[in-house]
Amino acid sequence: VRENRNRSMKTNHILLILVSLVVIAAVAYMLTSAESPEVYQEKIEAERERQYKFIRFNVESPLTEEQKRDFKELNFYPIDPNYKVKARLIPVENRKVREVPMTDGSVERYIEHSYAEFELGGKTNRLLLLQSVSESDMRNFFLAFADETSGRETYGGGRYINARQDGKNSITIDFNLAYNPYCAYNPDYACPLPPKENILNISIQAGEKNYKD
């Protein structure tokens, strides 16, 4: 009996050690996988550099050759991690195709997919996530929005974010990655306008600012 009891105690002790190791490993993983402020800063800066090179050098750039010759830089707000938010996904009931107005008066077709609900600026905000009718990856969304900086510090026709679902019922929206549509650089382009649901009553002082010739 004593031998069985000792064996049982040893087994429980081993299980306790294994559980402790699993917990320690999980905590270590969370700590090492969490993005440090320095890594986050570098990631945003790298994306901005990529964006600059595309606008400055790529043949698909919206800039004319004359604009490219005079082009010096893109204008951004300082990087602020507070503008990276985790939003709750709320599926749109009875999803339908919406004809989104373009800056030239035409329309482009998108699916009304979900609402992204998040806290920012001391209030609860909600943005409509659209999905192109030709999108093959169902986790990718198109987000066009305007806010209280629009028409002043940022482009009056709104800004865009390429959003990707990263949780079962959630999505990360990083306003530091907000960028201008092509028509902000060249009026010969036609660009989707933000839906009325996506006109925010707060200032989003993050991402790209007005383009200056």
Predicted regions and their residues:
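Ser/Thr/Pro/Gly-rich low-complexity linker/stalk segments immediately outside membranes or between
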Residues: 33-46
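Mid-length scaffold segments of soluble, non-membrane domains
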Residues: 93-157
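Extended, aromatic/histidine-rich regions of cofactor-dependent oxidoreductases associated
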Residues: 38, 179-213
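Extracytoplasmic/periplasmic/luminal assembly and interaction segments
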Residues: 47, 62-101
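Short, Lys/Arg-enriched N-terminal segments with co-localized hydrophobic residues
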Residues: 1-8
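Positively charged n-region of N-terminal signal peptides that target proteins for export
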Residues: 9-14
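Acidic, glycine-rich flexible loop segments
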Residues: 143-179
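Hydrophobic membrane-insertion alpha-helices, especially the h-region
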Residues: 15-30
